[in-house]
Amino acid sequence: MTTTGTARTELSTNKGFAKGTLGIMGIAVSPVKADRVWAMVENKDQGGLYRSEDGGATWSKINDERKLRQRAWYYTRLYADTQDADGLYVLNVRYHKSTDGGKSFETANAPHGDHHDLWIAPEDNQRMIMADDGGAQVSTDGGASWSTYHNQPTA
């Protein structure tokens, strides 16, 4: 659903989107390409990652790997890269990174599992903060390495 002032538009009934009972969804809009929208959909038969190139008017299912929605009943988080229109992160027990718009993903781990939230610096996509069951970890190299959660100073 999108909102423009007081008007709302339901996007999940548009062409190409999953039909039937829809569970928890994760949504991300590319800050680089504003009409690109991703939706991770919990659905018994049609669950997976959907992408729209026209602001949600039409959708295509681009990935149905189960690992991406392993805990859809618990949390489903998507994060669009702040510099790369094809960059997308899916958080779960592990986290998954796509560099091809969501068609494929590489799986990675921060020092602790059960990844819940991710912040990507708007001006530098190499600076990130991952929030998980162990606290928070910082990366300055796009997730190639992460700070430890042991003895990390907090304010």
Residue ranges and their predicted role:
Residues M1-A155:
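Beta-propeller blade termini and top-face loops
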